[in-house]
Design a protein with these regions (language model features):
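Bacterial carbohydrate/catabolite-sensing allosteric modules
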Residues: 1-237, 241-250, 254-260, 264-272, ...
Length: 300
C-alpha cells in the first residue's frame, strides 16, 4: 500500500507514502521570506483546535530557532477569525510579515488590512501556505505555496513500482514532495507569469481541520467564492469584473459580444456557484469579503 494526498506527519510509519508535508511546506515558505529580508514574522489566523495549524505553528517555532536574527509569533482564534486579526493588530508594529495557513484566511486578512488602513505590501508583507484561485484574483495577489499533486502522483507510482521489485514485505519507502513558492504582489512581486498556479484540489485533507474554520461566516463566504472561481472561464471573469464595475447587462452584452440568453446563462451560473441568488447578493458577498480591487478579467 502506498499512501498519498495525506500529510506525511499523519501517516503511520508502517506505511509507505509519497505525499506532501505541512512541516516541510512551512519551512519552505519561511526560507523564502527570510531570503527576502523578513525578520519579524507573525503567523496569523491559526485555529486553536486545528491539528493542521498546530503543525504549522510548531514547524515555525522549531525552524526559527536556527535563525537567532529572526523572530516569530502566532495569533490564534477560538470562535471567529477576526479574534486572531485583532490580536495581531494590537501588536502590528512589531512585525514586518504575516504568514497565513491558507488563502482563505489570507484574503480575509487582506480585507481586514483594508479596513484598518494597512497597505500591503508597503506596510506589511503577506503570504500563505496554500494556493487557491481567490489568492490569484484579489489585489494585491497573494504569494503562496502550491502543492504539486502531479509530482505526488508520479512519485506514488515510482514508489509502488520499487516496492513490487523489492519484494520484501517489511520494506517501507517514504517520500515527501516539496511545494512550489509562487511569488505575487503581496510580497512585492509584480503580477506576471508567477500568477499561474499549480493544480490544487481545494482544501487538501480538510477532514483534519478542527474548530470553527468551516463555520466562520467570513471564511465560508470566501469558500463559496472559491468554488465559483473554479467554475469560471476567462469570459466569466470578465463578466464578474463588469458586474463589480456597475455596468448594466445591456452594456456587458455589447462589450463582450454576447447574446442576451448567453449572458443570462453565464450570470446565473456565476451566482449559483457563489451560492447567491441575485446580482445585489453577489456584489454584497464581494464587497463584504473580498478585496476592494481585483484582477478579474485581466491579462496574465
Amino acid at each position: 500500500i502506498v499512501v498519498t494526498n495525506v500529510d506525511a506527519d499523519h501517516i503511520d510509519a508502517h506505511y509507505s507514502c509519497a505525499t506532501f508535508s505541512r512541516r516541510i511546506i512551512t519551512e519552505q515558505m519561511l526560507d523564502h521570506l527570510l531570503d527576502k529580508g523578513c525578520r519579524r514574522i507573525a503567523m496569523v489566523g491559526l485555529g486553536q483546535r486545528s491539528f493542521n495549524d498546530m503543525v504549522h505553528q510548531d514547524a515555525m517555532a522549531q525552524y526559527l530557532l536556527k535563525y537567532p536574527y529572526a523572530e516569530g509569533a502566532c495569533f490564534e482564534y477560538q470562535n471567529r477569525i477576526d479574534e486572531s486579526f485583532n490580536a495581531f493588530y494590537a501588536m502590528r508594529d512589531g512585525f514586518d510579515t504575516v504568514l497565513c495557513p491558507n488563502a482563505f484566511v489570507a484574503v480575509a486578512f487582506l480585507h481586514f488590512c483594508e479596513e484598518k488602513g494597512i497597505v500591503v505590501p508597503n506596510d506589511l508583507l503577506v503570504a500563505c501556505m496554500k494556493d487557491h484561485s481567490i489568492g490569484r484574483y484579489c489585489k494585491p495577489s497573494l504569494t503562496s505555496l502550491a502543492v504539486d499533486f502531479f509530482a505526488i502522483g508520479e512519485q506514488s507510482v515510482i514508489v509502488w513500482q520499487y516496492l513490487q521489485e523489492e519484494g520484501n514485505e517489511r520494506f517501507r519507502m517514504r517520500i515527501a514532495i516539496q511545494g512550489h513558492v509562487i511569488e505575487r504582489e503581496s510580497t512585492g512581486s509584480a503580477l506576471g507569469g508567477g500568477a499561474q498556479s499549480l493544480v490544487n484540489d481545494g482544501t487538501l485533507d480538510g477532514e483534519y481541520e478542527g474548530g470553527p474554520f468551516y463555520t466562520d461566516p467570513e471564511l465560508q463566504a470566501l469558500m463559496s467564492l472559491e468554488r465559483c472561481l473554479q467554475n469560471c472561464d476567462e469570459l466569466d471573469l470578465r463578466i464578474i469584473r463588469l458586474l463589480l464595475d456597475g455596468e448594466h447587462y445591456d452594456a456587458i452584452s455589447e462589450q463582450l459580444y454576447l447574446g442576451d440568453s448567453s449572458l443570462q446563462y453565464r450570470v446565473r451560473k456565476i451566482f449559483h456557484s457563489a451560492q447567491t441568488k441575485s446580482r445585489d447578493e453577489f456584489i454584497r458577498l464581494m464587497r463584504n469579503s473580498f478585496t476592494r480591487n481585483t484582477h478579474f478579467g485581466e491579462e496574465e
